[in-house]
Structure formats: structure tokens, C-alpha cells
């Protein structure tokens, strides 16, 4: 039966309740950088309960809060651009969602922005196409030579790496998935800006790029000496190109 033709007054049909979807942008600081993706979700579930927000629940024998999060962050990394979609059973002001959650979330997790989006808006996870990172590299890199070394690295027609899949490992060319890479080092140390493909179609992790770059320079790669910070997750806006997941989507 076509959805538009359903008569909800008939016995056996229940008209679905209207839900309101709020996209929140939040940080993941040093205090919580070793908390994994699933634990972040549980953390939000508890915070929503404590905040007494009118969250929507799934139907069935084991109802759960309707919330989802964008691309998982590498364990040990920090971020200022994490996103989640939270469905509410009642319409409330977006600033209230942000305000009340920030009262109950732990140090290191802070809601920076909240917008009400339409049901037609792609989920945060589905919309991702790119991600921006700052990499805090170790002292093996020469700050004065770094920009030239990056340019030489990117001049390669292909950059082959061994990538793990669910079943095995395979050699993959990642060159087209590196949108930008540059030296942004300062007096505090070696820093590299990365702009990479991300999401369900193509997903390139910053640590894969850095391992490949160190190998290109014939330097030992010690992964625990390098820190990663995600600046933002990006979607492709039909009018403006790549924008943050929380930009140009709010209806209030």
C-alpha cells in the first residue's frame, strides 16, 4: 500500500509521531581522547537523560534513543569538529539543546553549535565527504625543508599504501584522496595541515598519510609520537562546494 494512501483511522495502523532532528557540533578534548566511539554514544545517552530533554525513542521491545554520530575519530585524537544527530519528540529551541547538554556532559566534550534540520537532510554519517586535520608531528621532520618535502611527496603520480579492509589487506593508491597537505609549523613544533577524503565512499585516515610520508622521507614512523586533531568534517553543498556538516542546513 502506498504510504500516501494509508488511512490511519483504520484498525491496525498507528500514525507515526513527528520527530525533530537536531544536529550538534561538539568537541572531543584531551580529557576524553581515549574514549571510543561507542562510549561517546553512551555518554551522550546518559547526558540526554540527565538533561531531561524530550528525546525520541525507537519502537519495539527494546526502545532506544534515536541518535547517530558521524565518522568515528581515531582513538587518542582530539577534535573541534565532531557531529551527531539527535531526534526529539518535541520541538524546542536549538540553543536549549546545546545549553542543557553542556550542563551534563563531562569536561572535554562541549556542544559548540546546535541546529534544527529537516528530515530530508542527509544524516551526518551519510553526508561526510571530507575531513580537515592538524597533525602534530615529531622532531624528526626538518621545519625548514618540510614544505618542499610535502610538495615533492604530492608530485608523485600515485601514492601506494597497504590498507586494511574487513577481510584482508590490499595495496591502494591514496593520491586522489589527499585534497591538500601543507606545512603549518610554528615556534611550538612541526605541524601539518591535511585535507582528506572521508565518508562511506572514500575514507582516508590521517595516520595512513603520515606513515606514507615518513616512508617517502626514509624516516622511522613512530605512531605514538604523533598527535592528530580533527578540525572539521565536511559535506558537499550544491551551491557552495565543501562546507562543514553543520553549515547551511538549519531551518532555525
Predicted feature descriptions by range:
Residues 96-105, 146-154, 209-210:
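Short amphipathic alpha-helices in soluble, non-transmembrane regions
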